[in-house]
Amino acid sequence: MEIVISAIIGLLIGGTVVFVIKRLQDNNKKKSARFEAERIVNKANSEAAKIKKESENKAKDFESRARKNVEQDIHKQKSTLKNKESQLERRLKEVEDQFKQKMEENERYLNSLKDREEKIAISENRIKDLEKKGEAHIGELKQKLESVAAMSQDEARRQLLTALEDEAKQEAAKKIAQIEEEANKESEKKAKRILATALSRFASEYTSERTVSVLALPNDEMKGKIIGREGRNIRTLEAHCGVDLIVDDTPEAVVISGFDPVRRELARRTIEKLMEDGRVHPARIEEVAEKQRNELMKSMKEEGERHVMELGIPNMHPELVKIIGGLKYRSYQGQNALNQSLEVATIAGLLAAELGVSVKLARRAGLLHNIGKAIDHTVEGSYAFVGAEAAKKYNESEDVCHAIRAHDEEEKPHSILAWIVHAAYTLSSSRPGARRPQMDTFIHRLEDLESIGNSFDGVLKTLALQAGKDIRVLVESSRVTDDQAVMLSRDIARKIEREMPQAGQVKVTVVRETRSVEHAR
């Protein structure tokens, strides 16, 4: 029994202990759960604070960027408004200037009207005075008639009419002289105004002429190629291009000398093409020179077409266009012929606009006035008449042809178009820096030397080199023998002495070359 009681008591104690332990465990779990919950809550609060802080930072960053964008937009709008304001101010100033100009013109017009009114008033007063004088004179005549009653009625009438006629003639002569004087003053004033208006709307460059061109070479090796063995290449270039090539100690450069700009341009293009190709020998030089000559002719035509289009001149013959392009390489008294033609055409157009004449026709005549200078100098006659004949040949009107002939007073101008072109030519030629007469004299001297050489039979080409101190005459080997070449050089020298005694010492070199070509098949 005691065992049972002990067992029961033990069970009770054990159950109590188990209960107490279980209770303690439950309390611990609750406590740990509470701690865990608090930890989770604290963590959530921390993350929430972190997210809040990040959101605030992002919001601040977004606000900063937005403010910056707004400020930039405001700055751009301010700049745009400022530009528009400047434009409006400029436009307002232009309008004010125009208004001021119009007001000045109106004032001048009103002043002229006042002057006319004053003149009219003076004329009316003069007429009244004349009427009074006439009435008084008539009264005197009546008294005379009364005093000479012995006169017949017809005689008295004749005397009265004669006296009135003489007085009227005197008054008319005075009035005519006054009108002529006023007309001359007014026409001179208007002419000066027209010329001043035309010149103020056009300005051109100062003219300077040169007879040499410096061509840069890539290296001195190319200089040696241009010279060639024993100078064969350089002699071939000079013969086919008609210039004098000067190769000195200047590094990587060769000087092209010649009075004809067309020949200098041909030589420059030929040498540049040979440098690109790298093959330099006489046969290649001859081939390239011929090709570049054709391309140069093509470029001259394109140059003429461009200027004709710029001036708005319609329906011009292609040959005339080509001749106009050729003026680019011609000069007269140091003035480039094409630039001078464009200058005359522009001034003629401005004068025509002021005078109410066809602007296009005036520009056409002004542009064509110089074409005689681009035609081969072997054609006889002055350049004005040669140019007029060429214009007539290519279907230009008689008014244009007459303006070409009369622009330099070789023919008396008898049309308004001819006078306009003559005035434009005079203005272009007489402005400061337009011409250099000594250059033109020098070029004519070289052309005369070449013409003398070309006048002999068997001569292919004559080239004036070294400023006219050396001329080279290329002859046909089939027509001129070696002995004849010696005599030919002597004959040319004698003719130069006779016809150009002022030329000084001139070296005449006759070049006779025999070339044999055969093709292997």
UniProtKB/Swiss-Prot annotation:
Cellular localisation: Cell membrane
TM regions (residue ranges): 1-21
Bilayer topology term: Single-pass membrane protein
Primary localization class, coarse: membrane
Region of interest: Disordered: 51-87
Entry's EC annotation: 3.1.-.-
GO molecular function: RNA binding; RNA endonuclease activity
Top EC group: hydrolase
PROSITE patterns linked to this entry: HD, KH_TYPE_1
GO cellular component terms, A-Z: plasma membrane
Single GO biological process annotation from the record: mRNA catabolic process
Protein name: Ribonuclease Y 1
Organism (species): Bdellovibrio bacteriovorus (strain ATCC 15356 / DSM 50701 / NCIMB 9529 / HD100)
Originating gene: rny1
